[in-house]
């Protein structure tokens, strides 16, 4: 469950290391985001020479969440950390690599490029 002020790890090679959620997209009263949801975030920590720098405002999709998500068969999938991937307006990732596993629920939200780059889909 991601809300405003939540810090997330960045799971791609854009140069950002940590981002902080500043808005959950999808309605004026929406408070929380989970796996597959899009947020607006500010880059809080970045590596030198990366695509993005500290202070940039970016769009991200949540790929891992400590809260987890319930599947139709009744099982739950949850992760050890909150992680996001920086995306463009057309839902494609800004980076060329994805680090760590991602949830299968991204397929329902049509993030096929992220799924194809990910080393493991759970």
Swiss-Prot record:
Return the Gene3D superfamilies for the record: Ribosomal protein L14
Instruction: Please name the GO terms that the record assigns under molecular function.
Output: large ribosomal subunit rRNA binding; structural constituent of ribosome
What Pfam families does the database record attribute to this sequence? Ribosomal_L14
**What is this protein's function per UniProt?**
Binds to 23S rRNA. Forms part of two intersubunit bridges in the 70S ribosome.
Name the Gene Ontology biological process terms. translation
Family assignment from sequence similarity: Belongs to the universal ribosomal protein uL14 family.
Ordered alphabetically, the record's keywords are: Ribonucleoprotein, Ribosomal protein, RNA-binding, rRNA-binding
Q: Does the keyword RNA-binding apply?
A: yes
Q: Does the keyword Secreted apply?
A: no
Q: Which domain of life is it from?
A: Bacteria
**Subunit details for this protein?**
Part of the 50S ribosomal subunit. Forms a cluster with proteins L3 and L19. In the 70S ribosome, L14 and L19 interact and together make contacts with the 16S rRNA in bridges B5 and B8.
**Full protein name:** Large ribosomal subunit protein uL14
- GO cellular component terms? cytosolic large ribosomal subunit
């Amino acid at each position: 469950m991601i809300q405003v002020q939540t810090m997330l790890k960045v799971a791609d090679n854009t140069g950002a290391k940590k981002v902080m959620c500043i808005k959950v997209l999808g309605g004026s009263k929406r408070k929380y985001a989970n796996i597959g949801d899009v947020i607006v975030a500010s880059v809080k920590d970045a590596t030198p020479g990366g695509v993005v720098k500290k202070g940039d405002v970016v769009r991200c999709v949540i790929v891992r969440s400590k809260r987890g998500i319930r599947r139709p068969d009744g099982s739950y999938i949850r992760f050890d950390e909150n992680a996001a991937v920086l995306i463009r307006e057309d839902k494609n990732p800004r980076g060329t690599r994805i680090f760590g596993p991602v949830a299968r629920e991204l397929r329902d939200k049509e993030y096929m490029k992220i799924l194809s780059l990910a080393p493991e889909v759970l």
